[in-house]
Amino acid sequence: MNFILASSSERRKELLKRIVENFEVIPSDYDEKEVAFNGNCSEYVMELSKGKALNVASKLKRDSGIIIASDTIVYFNGEVLGKPSSKEHAYEMLKSLSGEVHEVYSGIVIYDLSSKKIKADYSCSKVKFSNLDDKMIREYIKTGEPMDKAGSYGIQGYGGIFVEKIHGCYYNIVGLPINKLYFLLKEMGVNL
């Protein structure tokens, strides 16, 4: 079976290797602004993931293979926290998350190029941050790590020191809930 990861994320590549030995990487250039947030996080991340999968499918000149696409958001106080637009924006996000609980949603879409069948699911995890002081936040931002991550932190990196506890799937917070992915692939009849 030919697998295609519709992402350039190093984190997703590392996680996918845990369940799929060989795969091709074809990043999506889907414009996420095409999907308006309607207040439902699970629908939103699945719709974004579907857009990425179909975007990659439209670039391919083949009729077999499985496309795997995912999108992750942080949700806090009624707002979606995406990737920060600047260091100051990252600071504001991290300061707002300090001492609070937020939710991390990841959508997963599996698209079979031969049958045109789509399966979608999502995962939600809750994350509690410790109280962060300004120095901690500024030092973290200097590492550059928060600049390409939803919510301005990476639990698998230096940002993990901010996390007091989680409820749910750790891999979801990293960016690819491999348990959900494994069972979605099984539902599609893919043997791993």
UniProtKB/Swiss-Prot annotation:
The keyword Membrane does not apply. Nucleoside triphosphate pyrophosphatase that hydrolyzes dTTP and UTP. May have a dual role in cell division arrest and in preventing the incorporation of modified nucleotides into cellular nucleic acids. It catalyses: dTTP + H2O = dTMP + diphosphate + H(+); UTP + H2O = UMP + diphosphate + H(+). Its cofactor is a divalent metal cation. It is found in: Cytoplasm. This is dTTP/UTP pyrophosphatase. GO terms for cellular component: cytoplasm. Belongs to the Maf family. YhdE subfamily. It holds the Pfam family Maf. Keywords: Cytoplasm, Hydrolase, Nucleotide metabolism.
